[in-house]
Amino acid sequence: MTAHAAALAAADAPAPVDRSPGALGWPVTAALRALAMDGVEQAKSGHPGAPMGMAEIAAVLWREHLRHNPADPSWPDRDRFVLSNGHGSMLIYALLHLTGYDLPIAELKRFRQLHSRTPGHPELGMTPGVETTTGPLGQGLANAVGMAIAEKTLAAQFNRPGLSIVDHRTFVFLGDGCLMEGVSHEACSLAGRLGLGKLVAFYDDNGISIDGKVEEWFPDDTPARFAAYGWHVIRNVDGHDPAMLRDAVEAALSETGKPTLICCKTTIGRGAPTKEGHQDTHGAPLGAEEIARTRAAMGWDHAPFEVPEDIYALWDARRSGAARQSAWDARMEAYERAYPAEAAEFRRRLKGDLSPAFAATYAAALKATVEKAETVATRKASQLALAALAPAVPEFLGGSADLAHSNLTTFPGAVPITRDPAGNQIFYGVREFGMSAIANGIALHGGFIPFVATFLVFSDYARNAMRMSALMGQRVIYILTHDSIGLGEDGPTHQPVEHVESLRLIPNLDVWRPADTVETLAAWHAALTRTNGPSAFILSRQNLPCWPRDAAQIEGIEAGAYVLRESEGLARAVLVATGSEVKLAAAAADLLDTAGIPTRIVSMPCRERFEALTETERAALFPKGVPVVAVEAGVTRGWRGLSGTRADGIIAIGIDRFGESAPEKDLWPLFGFTPEAVADAVRRAVG
């Protein structure tokens, strides 16, 4: 070949691929981008843009700083990692696979397929290493705040000089969408106030969302916003420069008094020659042609889902993770020798078991509650239950959305964490959504049983976080007071009508509407002993009488429904009621008994538990052919279709319109909630 021909051939040859850190050809990030592209392409749906844009951020964090052990995803002192922008799920699946978790390549090939371990958005319990279910934007960030609160509080409660058994960080990835959601304001404002120095957030500032360039609708000065919250803000980090990222992470780790936001300027879909930086990469496959071009640009000449062993070796965290956990195990053993009682308590709380003292404490509280038979509002009954049970539940970490003295969530021994880092009470401020999503993070972290509180009518603000509690099966307790038109003068803006029925629509959420002090205490017992889902308490503002019961009836409370008062003679009708309307049902039954219509009263504090009973158990409450009249101060639709009764049909007395502003005494008769009106409905049903 002549010199001229050789020069021409050299000019036509592809340029050598730069494989240095930060370059497209860096094998560490090329593997992440390739797996993200391949997974979305094979599924024919998904979001490749964020994983491709955050590859360098992920590489620096996961390879150099994240303390975790792929062989034991539940190691108590692991760092927590949350992908708040959960649509970019192929990023976390690729990270978990490459670092050595039990997530084989076959599962990445089944991305978004039925019964795979790689669902469209990360789901708790589906994939080892996934700390929380994310997808509803902003909530992962709030979960991370909750995890950081739990870490800080647990450390204050259990660490001893020279023996720190709780010492880990919470890292969270988030995007523009997370920051546009209001829950991010609620959670991050509180995080700054609480000085969560072990919380580090990475902001993927790529300027793109589904509709295009976010500058048209999200021009906020995000760094200034977070500085105002009291965060440590690291600005203008090139999200594709490993050296800058490394410096930023080290600066974040050196800040112990404030949470840190690292603002990373990135390009969505980085590496895709014709699509990077464009909204098309956000939520759709790149296509075979674009993927081929991207592979060429990265110098990635491997087949789809193929990763060479030498690149796996660059990612493998099993040895370093095992060493870190081994060091913690040694520290834990020393702690057990020095503080055996505290060590046993620590392990119990992380396991989620109730204390050995709980059963006896509850039994004593139940005996006292039955004997006192106090006439109080059920919100007060809840406070009494808290006070009685709290000494045996040191893992309580609860609070209210600026309504502690209305929801009655304070109790003897409640200490705000702002005054004592080892406390057990959180003043959340008016942040219902943030409060509830933070509580999910506290529950997910382990070591605590969170409870939160607001007015029932404002549960709408918290609803999606409540749904996430149920979806993830987390033991979070929601105290929702001022439950009906019974709160009176505040009017329809504050009088819940549809809310109880709406909450009952959420799968795996136990909704309790107790009638008195005994049912309220039993509801607390049921919620605390339930480990696979949340519970909501619907509580009255007005005082309610305490009903006499025998042991079998008390046991029936936690079954969800039971005969509170049997008819004199064979029942010709059944009145079923909840909460404050049990009192009304009893008064109506008195009128009916006098009129020669024997009427059974069934109290149904938890419809979800009633519906879980066997057909035989349900039939024992509602005999076949006996008319049933349901009474509840809310919408009637759910009662009309109540499953499990053997009645031919149910007549529901409720409120199917909004309330009125007036004294309570004027509202009940206005809406037909009188003994006479209920008795008349039963008479019509009996015929």
Curated annotation (Swiss-Prot):
GO terms (molecular function) for this protein are: metal ion binding; transketolase activity
Keyword Zinc in the entry? The reply is: no
Q: Which SMART domains match?
A: Transket_pyr (SM00861)
- Give the EC number(s) listed in the UniProt record: 2.2.1.1
Q: Which residues does this entry assign to the site Important for catalytic activity?
A: 47, 282
Q: What Pfam families does this protein's entry cite?
A: Transket_pyr, Transketolase_C_1, Transketolase_N
Report the cofactors: Mg(2+); thiamine diphosphate
The organism's superkingdom is given as Bacteria
- SUPFAM superfamilies for this protein: Thiamin diphosphate-binding fold (THDP-binding), TK C-terminal domain-like
The name of this protein is Transketolase 2
Note how many cofactor molecules are bound and how: Binds 1 thiamine pyrophosphate per subunit.
> Which species is the source of this protein?
Xanthobacter flavus
UniProt GO cellular component terms? cytosol
Q: Which Gene3D superfamilies match?
A: 3.40.50.920, 3.40.50.970
Which cysteines are disulphide-bonded? none
Key words of the record: Magnesium, Metal-binding, Thiamine pyrophosphate, Transferase
InterPro entries, A to Z? THDP-binding, Transketo_C/PFOR_II, Transketolase-like_C_2, Transketolase-like_Pyr-bd, Transketolase_bac-like, Transketolase_CS, Transketolase_fam, Transketolase_N
Sorted alphabetically, the Gene Ontology BP terms of this entry are:
pentose-phosphate shunt
